Amino acid sequence: MIRVGIIGATGYTGLELVRLLKNHPEAKITYLSSRTYAGKKLEEVFPSTLENSILSEFDPEKVSKNCDVLFTALPAGASYDLVRELKGVKIIDLGADFRFDDPGVYREWYGKELSGYENIKRVYGLPELHREEIKNAQVVGNPGCYPTSVILALAPALKRNLVDPETILVDAKSGVSGAGRKEKVDYLFSEVNESLRPYNVAKHRHVPEMEQELEKISGKKVNVVFTPHLVPMTRGILSTIYVKTDKSLEEIHEAYLEFYRNEPFVHVLPMGIYPSTKWCYGSNHVFIGMQMEERTNTLILMSAIDNLVKGASGQAVQNMNIMFGLDETKGLEFTPIYP
């Protein structure tokens, strides 16, 4: 049985980890931490968890003694120093602190210096692309939600050199839970309900993460123009991607079917069928559709994920499974909730 700890257990991704891991046949939650609710039982704060473990302040000695793996479900910049205090524990960080190959990129976009970063054996935790490296990883940087939807949608096309990577346009829409569990006027019901708006246009911090991984796939310079939008729903991301090509839709579709043929969570839809966020609600599944705009030779790719599952906690559990030599679908086999 894998002994599991969660730091940040009362945020949305932390709570999703609790939900998934309580139903995992090979995992046992042995440590839960929350600075805000330390000293309380989790079910006192969130009765829906049915979890009577007592939340505590972060204690590296207790984590090292009681956990085989630790999930850090904290905002960017909060995990790095905590993780460096631990010994003999595998780490899966759901923030951005371990996602970048170059710490200078993190410093530029997140405003923090990561001292000693070059000494950490870390892997970018997108299983469909880095499965072999994840198997032996000590620290996994779990991908961001938007990058997961965009990278998986583009990977086959870039790998097979089917599209022009020079300029990739991404229009993405996310439910409000993607912003995390925090008090901010922008996320009040009256502000979000019956409204659709863009945010962080041309400056979202997920852009360098997308470009890093897409360039590794293509072997070429990639430029992503990314506009995210907030939509009045709780969960889900739908990314629509526009990229130039001189290939036929049939050839591209066949390449996608082949690329993802053995992937348990990635589903390439038949031509003419387009994905919906409702299809992956509460699950680790990804749905990818495509269409060709013949007049301009533009391939239009569409991908749908649940931002809290495949975009965060589900993918983290998938990474844990790989790190401990389990079938990566363990604890994640359930179908989406519909309607």
Curated annotation (Swiss-Prot):
Question: Record's Pfam families?
Answer: Semialdhyde_dh, Semialdhyde_dhC_1
**Molecular function via GO:** N-acetyl-gamma-glutamyl-phosphate reductase activity; NAD binding; NADP+ binding
The record's Gene Ontology biological-process terms are: L-arginine biosynthetic process
- Annotated compartments: Cytoplasm
Where does this protein act, in terms of pathway?
Answer: Amino-acid biosynthesis; L-arginine biosynthesis; N(2)-acetyl-L-ornithine from L-glutamate: step 3/4
Where primarily located?
cytoplasm
EC assignment: 1.2.1.38
Family label? Belongs to the NAGSA dehydrogenase family. Type 1 subfamily.
Q: What is this protein called?
A: N-acetyl-gamma-glutamyl-phosphate reductase
Organism classification, top ranks? Answer: Bacteria, Thermotogati, Thermotogota, Thermotogae, Thermotogales
Q: Which gene encodes it?
A: argC
